[in-house]
Amino acid sequence: MSNTSGKIFSITSFGSSHGKAIGAVIDGCPANLELSEEDIQKELNRRKPGTNEITSPRKESDKVQIISGIFNGKTDGTPITGIVFNKDQKSHDYESIKNTPRPGHGDYTWKTKYGNYDYHGGGRGSGRVTIGHVIAGAIAKKLLNSYGIKVISHVTQIGKIKAKTVNMNFIEDYASQNPVRCGDPNAAIAMEDLILEYKEKGDSVGGIVETIALGVPAGLGEPVFGKLDGDLAKALMEIGSVKGVEIGFGFDVATSRASEINDEFYFKNKDKDSEKFENRENRDKYKKNKDKLNKKEDTNQDEHIKNKYLSNYDIGTTTNTSGGILGGISNGMPIVTRIAVKPTPSISTMQNTVDLEKGEETKIKIKGRHDPCICPRITVVSESAVAIVLADHMLRSGFIHPSDITKH
């Protein structure tokens, strides 16, 4: 079983849904990063259950304890261990599924592979193990923030309800204030109503979560087998319930022409009035001014001056269909990822399954406390996965000193 991810900045997670505790050990974080339990707690609070009607009613404080890696309020370069003790387990709810695998869950595959499988609340396969992701992600985000990198996320779709494209301020301000974590106020209301409708029916619904990383420098990523987008896709797919990943335009590139989606370059400091276009809607706005932009002449510039642009000027792209990554390497534009999250498989509707002990087909109606939609709580997990990968690549590419952040 693989429980560790990352080359330099790495996470080893441990624990299970109904075990004594869940947590993570983080290796590779340089010394002298100011870090407190509160830094991690505020992220865990975004993930914890029982906060509103559209989350699991399981009541957990998810209070984190840092038991190593911090000295005098700063990281000391040694492994950081964060642990959360489980408080509100109801393991008896799961005795009925001991030998009857739940449709949509990993019960059957885990039992087939390992034999000795903790079926209580999904055990190690539960979404609750993402507590470890969030602990590590909180540290990664604190590290990235000190280098001007911000990672944010929001829900863009629940069921068939899609949010309108909103600016970054709405995502940062409004998405954090509503239970659905959506930046479009009107869509957020409709999404919440839809989730409650499915909850009333004993069913669940899926959706899409978008995560954006701002301020990432050009140069992260190690082709051929260490591509930044490859590592991001892997990290995001390793989150439970995620069944698909897109970067930039994603699957829409399959129906596009290169002339439509190639991200054209420009010198940001040379033409300060040019905008960075980060989404599909703004691309059309750019095309209206494209000819005018292309006709600008580099007069009175000799070859020496032109070459200086490569080091003295920031280079941007007029669109961002690539999602901030070209050839497996970051290009300095915002990194944009989206994950498709399946409906929570634990539902109270009657379903067909098999009894592995009796060797016969049977019916199952799942008990327990479950989310009618996991998307709102998975936003912070997606942020964490992206932040962990970026922190690792920042260290691998030399943007962060590996032992002491004050030395860079």
Regions found by a protein language model. Give the residues of each.
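N-terminal, positively charged regions that mediate nucleic acid binding
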Residues: 1-58
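A short glycine/serine-rich beta->alpha loop
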Residues: 10-13, 117-129, 218-222, 320-326, ...
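Alpha-helical support elements that line or immediately flank enzyme active sites
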Residues: 20-32, 128-149, 230-234, 333-335, ...
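Internal helix-turn-beta structural module
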Residues: 10, 343-408
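Glycine-rich, mobile lid/loop segments that gate access to catalytic sites or pores
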Residues: 112-224
